């Protein structure tokens, strides 16, 4: 233990330049890098997620457009809401219509709403 205490004391007395030089020497001698591997893996994870295609979507009614009554009918059909609830949802646009749906279903909902005159976003 006495030897470790001496090493700790010597390392504590190093200047910043000397410590950096020591790190370089140890990296070369042991063939390692002082960079934290966790930081590298964490930085690579978001890139991998971005590369994977999104599977679940949220259909958002951006605006009802000019044919509000038609849009309310379609929203009622898609969501299973009553007429009053569907009207309220359309009036409060932008508002999510349906969440966690597969791409094909989201595209189908989007096309129905757009055919009724609404502006729709997939998120």
Swiss-Prot record:
InterPro entries the record matches: Ribosomal_bL12, Ribosomal_bL12_C, Ribosomal_bL12_C/ClpS-like, Ribosomal_bL12_oligo, Ribosomal_bL12_oligo_N_sf
Alphabetic keyword roster: Ribonucleoprotein, Ribosomal protein
Highest taxon of the lineage: Bacteria
SUPFAM superfamilies: ClpS-like, Ribosomal protein L7/12, oligomerisation (N-terminal) domain
An annotated GO cellular component: ribonucleoprotein complex
GO annotation (BP), single: translation
A GO MF label: structural constituent of ribosome
Pfam family, one: Ribosomal_L12_N
PANTHER family: 39S RIBOSOMAL PROTEIN L12 (PTHR45987), LARGE RIBOSOMAL SUBUNIT PROTEIN BL12M (PTHR45987:SF4)
Function per UniProt: Forms part of the ribosomal stalk which helps the ribosome interact with GTP-bound translation factors. Is thus essential for accurate translation.
Subunit and partners: Homodimer. Part of the ribosomal stalk of the 50S ribosomal subunit. Forms a multimeric L10(L12)X complex, where L10 forms an elongated spine to which 2 to 4 L12 dimers bind in a sequential fashion. Binds GTP-bound translation factors.
Family: Belongs to the bacterial ribosomal protein bL12 family.
Name of this chain's protein: Large ribosomal subunit protein bL12
Organism field: Rickettsia bellii (strain OSU 85-389)
Gene encoding the protein: rplL
């Amino acid at each position: 233990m006495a030897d470790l205490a001496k090493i700790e004391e010597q390392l504590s007395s190093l200047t910043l330049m000397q410590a950096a030089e020591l790190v370089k020497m140890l990296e070369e001698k042991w063939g390692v890098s002082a960079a934290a591997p966790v930081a590298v893996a964490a930085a690579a994870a978001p890139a991998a997620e971005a590369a994977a295609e999104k599977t679940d979507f949220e259909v958002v009614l951006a605006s009802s457009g000019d044919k509000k009554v038609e849009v309310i009918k379609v929203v009622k059909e898609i969501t299973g809401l009553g007429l009053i609830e569907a009207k309220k949802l359309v009036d409060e646009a932008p508002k999510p219509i349906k969440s966690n749906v597969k791409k094909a279903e989201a595209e189908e909902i989007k096309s129905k709403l757009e055919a009724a005159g609404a502006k729709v976003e997939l998120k």
